[in-house]
Regions:
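Conserved catalytic alpha/beta core of Sir2/sirtuin-type deacylases, generalized to analogous enzyme cores
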Residues: 1-206
Length: 206
């Protein structure tokens, strides 16, 4: 069984702060909402930040919110339905909910993952850990909305800024890590009765 999981699953479990000024948005992003007046977490990605320190203060808050969130009840409800079944997860979600619940080999995150950084300029095919740098930025920021300059994450190869390995609001790197995710899905397809349909559908999408 192939299970497709998208943003509605997270929103149903309380991760509904992306598009509107609601209680969960205010819970996690109140300092930014009150100071910069944008409504919804995704709006912050388009905000005209005056400094990189402010920008990364916001981005670190965004990433930390999803990295540290517990498994949401909507995912636990889905898990109950999947008990005893042979399944594979294909998701466009980047918020790490599925990989908190299931082994990595059972999940293909084809739109990226908030746990990793890439080079913003895509100078390298590498991705690397974002969890500790994000935690350090949030700790250093405290109740402020900006981070110290020396904590702005950098690419270890070119020295330019890093960026979350996610599609949608940056220069998404479709390199080694992306290929790993797509190969997991294709391998599952070839091992099932739906091999031809899955593989051709994926090939056409690419």
């Amino acid at each position: 069984m192939v299970v497709g999981g998208a943003s509605g699953l997270s929103a149903a479990g309380g991760g509904d702060f992306y598009y509107e000024d609601n209680d969960s948005y205010r819970k996690y992003f109140r300092p930014f909402a009150e100071k910069y007046h944008f409504k919804g977490a995704f709006a912050g990605m388009m905000h005209p930040w005056k400094t990189r320190e402010e920008y990364w203060g916001y981005l670190a808050t965004f990433l930390h919110t999803t990295q540290t969130a517990p498994v949401r009840h909507s995912y636990l409800d889905l898990d109950a339905l999947l008990k005893g079944k042979d399944f594979f997860i294909l998701t466009t979600n980047q918020d790490t909910q599925f990989v908190k619940l299931y082994p990595e080999e059972k999940v293909a995150e084809i739109q990226g993952d908030h746990r990793f950084f890439q080079c913003a300029a895509c100078c390298t095919d590498d991705t690397w850990d974002a969890v500790k740098p994000v935690a350090d930025m949030v700790a250093a920021m405290g109740s402020d909305t900006k981070i110290p300059t020396d904590l702005i994450p950098r690419c270890p190869h070119c020295g330019g800024e890093a960026f979350p390995w996610v599609r949608g609001y940056g220069n998404f790197l479709q390199g080694k890590k992306y290929e790993e995710q797509s190969k997991k899905f294709l391998a599952m397809c070839w091992n099932t009765k739906t091999a031809k349909f899955c593989s051709w559908s994926w090939a056409l999408a690419e």
